[in-house]
Amino acid sequence: MSFTPGKQSSSRASSGNRSGNGILKWADQSDQSRNVQTRGRRAQPKQTATSQQPSGGNVVPYYSWFSGITQFQKGKEFEFAEGQGVPIAPGVPATEAKGYWYRHNRRSFKTADGNQRQLLPRWYFYYLGTGPHAKDQYGTDIDGVYWVASNQADVNTPADILDRDPSSDEAIPTRFPPGTVLPQGYYIEGSGRSAPNSRSTSRASSRASSAGSRSRANSGNRTPTSGVTPDMADQIASLVLAKLGKDAAKPQQVTKQTAKEIRQKILNKPRQKRSPNKQCTVQQCFGKRGPNQNFGGGEMLKLGTSDPQFPILAELAPTAGAFFFGSRLELAKVQNLSGNLDEPQKDVYELRYNGAIRFDSTLSGFETIMKVLNENLNAYQQQDGTMNMSPKPQRQRGQKNGQGENDNISVAAPKSRVQQNKIRELTAEDISLLKKMDEPFTEDTSEI
């Protein structure tokens, strides 16, 4: 006896926009294109999973009994815990709850700026022995296939489930038994980006769909609304960003004005909350390096947390809990040196701490961490020594290379004997002149 999902206990089937057999119909799994009349537009046929053109995506060759699960975060794995992952279907016993999820690589679309954007994949469930991998055994390692089965199912035999005929059987909203953990970064089509609690999801979708039915019934001859899918949301978001000129692919240009604003914003924060970067250097945030602030040198003082080597050091930074509970703390009142004399003085306190960060050679990236620490610990001492060295004499403009050592000698006028401050003895002539200066002056009245 073959089983047909959704043919039994229709009252427990997911509520919503019900068609003849009480099963939801989804835009990505509809069998025929319906003509939808819209205001001022030509009728557009709905695209199904089999009618989509393979522009950067594969075509789903078979119809799944269930709505898909769409990925909305990159880098997230599609996986379920053992014994989980098979959707609930009225009329299908637990012994037949076995199959696989098939990854549908969706199409790409062109954004407003002319770039192609690839949509994240969507997964569809097929019972064992049906769908695109009907001839493959359970557990076969296939790219884009994830095998699931309940604990009561025998995975050595195919499921006794009929293939879905889209002309008579419509897609069932995907629901899971209580306790099923939905993969992180994925959401079930038609349920929003919600938690994996299938019952609450079903009730929420039931209330939303019934409210939508009442609004359509009250609208009279109002034209029916078209279905909104996550694909449309992605396209709308890209168009809005392009219209506003906020393309995420283009780096934001930092001008002098914006750099000044960023620096002022950082300096307005309390000292312990500042994060130095290219716009606000380490010295601007925390002052010059010295015995009490002895970390940082070279490029790290210029780039701060933007330095490529800083993230690996940040792994050593203690958490807030480790800071308070793993350190020796001391509260001290200090003199307030900020503010004008006319302003009321505030009480200023310092929470002084003393602790240690312990790590060993088994830490990931140990060699790199030691290299960065050795380069930046007490680096100010080497910098001070470099600054105290006499600068290299610079060649004057217009002077050619290869001249002798005399080129670097000063050409200033020689100093006089007085400037040289040399001691010499008086001669007889000097003594005679000094005596004449001491004699009284007499006017010569003789006539020539």
Swiss-Prot record:
Residues 52-194 are annotated as: RNA-binding. Residues 9-22, 193-223 have a biased composition (Low complexity). Keywords: ADP-ribosylation, Host Golgi apparatus, Phosphoprotein, Ribonucleoprotein, RNA-binding, Transcription, Transcription regulation, Viral nucleoprotein, Virion. It holds the Pfam family CoV_nucleocap. The modification Phosphothreonine is found at residues 174, 427. The keyword Transmembrane helix does not apply. Residues 266-384 are annotated as: Dimerization. Residues 29-38, 45-55, 383-393, 399-409 have a biased composition (Polar residues). PROSITE patterns: COV_N_CTD, COV_N_NTD. It is found in: Virion; Host endoplasmic reticulum-Golgi intermediate compartment; Host Golgi apparatus. GO terms for molecular function: RNA binding. Homooligomer. Both monomeric and oligomeric forms interact with RNA. Interacts with protein M. Interacts with NSP3; this interaction serves to tether the genome to the newly translated replicase-transcriptase complex at a very early stage of infection. Packages the positive strand viral genome RNA into a helical ribonucleocapsid (RNP) and plays a fundamental role during virion assembly through its interactions with the viral genome and membrane protein M. Plays an important role in enhancing the efficiency of subgenomic viral RNA transcription as well as viral replication. This is Nucleoprotein. The gene is N.
